[in-house]
């Protein structure tokens, strides 16, 4: 599987940055904590965390080499004390190392949330908190429904043989159960709509190409990929409002017992 275009993601991920900053406001910090940013991506939110813990420390983890390289470049002068680690969040190389774990738009790219939550609670110190947000429930149902129907058409279907969906949008109840099974207490999980409208067809097309449908794009030759994107963009133009992605955000929080 090809890696992210981290530079483009860094430039166009304003929705993820805005959501992440609001989630960060729900994480109580005094300024001395050691914080783990799970799925740090290109480093925008990692830098925001570092600003809130001037006497603490921040470690960002991601399984994308390209994202970590972009994050290193972004953080070099902004948060030089931040450490970056290449790791899968379902098997973090930490034990009782952090006062808090934060994550933005990451968990929906992983299919084993039970393993994920076990890994995170192991990385937390007793009393440490998890505050996170990811796609959940009916997230992007309109876009992925349209894309799925196109993928089944004869002109595209041969490129998607043995296709495995890379996303997993958990619901509230299953997330509560998995957090509890991992050992978390004070669990709080909720789902909220976050429809996101783009200025026009170019902005919409670029976003879905580089974020939502990145994996589909790796399967298609360039001419077919351009056709695929064009047809989805034409469909989005007929929506009300046009060029809107039907995002849903799953908010989750929990604490490792003291």
Where in this protein do the model-derived segments appear?
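Core SAM-dependent methyltransferase catalytic element
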Residues: 206-208, 250-258
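A short SAM/SAH-binding and catalytic strip from SAM-dependent methyltransferases
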Residues: 100-113
């Amino acid at each position: 599987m090809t890696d992210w275009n981290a530079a483009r993601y860094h430039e166009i991920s304003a929705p993820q940055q805005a959501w992440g900053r609001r989630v960060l406001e729900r994480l109580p910090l005094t300024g001395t904590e050691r914080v783990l940013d799970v799925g740090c991506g290109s480093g925008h939110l990692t830098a925001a965390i570092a600003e809130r813990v001037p006497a603490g420390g921040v470690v960002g983890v991601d399984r994308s080499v390209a994202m970590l390289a972009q994050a290193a470049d972004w953080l070099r002068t902004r948060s030089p004390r931040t450490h970056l680690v290449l790791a899968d969040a379902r098997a973090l190389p930490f034990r009782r190392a952090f006062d808090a774990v934060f994550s933005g738009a990451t968990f929906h790219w992983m299919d084993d949330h039970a393993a994920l939550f076990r890994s995170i609670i192991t990385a937390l110190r007793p009393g440490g908190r998890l505050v996170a947000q990811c796609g959940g429930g009916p997230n992007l149902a309109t876009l992925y429904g349209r894309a799925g129907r196109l993928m089944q058409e004869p002109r595209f279907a041969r490129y998607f043989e043995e296709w495995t969906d890379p996303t997993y949008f958990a619901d509230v109840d299953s997330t509560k159960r998995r957090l509890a099974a991992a050992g978390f207490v004070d669990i709080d999980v909720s789902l909220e709509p976050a429809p996101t409208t783009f200025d026009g067809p170019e902005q919409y097309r670029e976003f879905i190409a580089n974020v939502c449908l990145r994996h589909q794009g790796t399967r298609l030759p360039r001419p077919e990929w351009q056709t695929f994107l064009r047809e989805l963009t034409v469909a989005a133009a007929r929506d009300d409002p046009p060029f809107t992605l039907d995002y849903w955000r799953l908010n989750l929080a929990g604490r490792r017992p003291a």
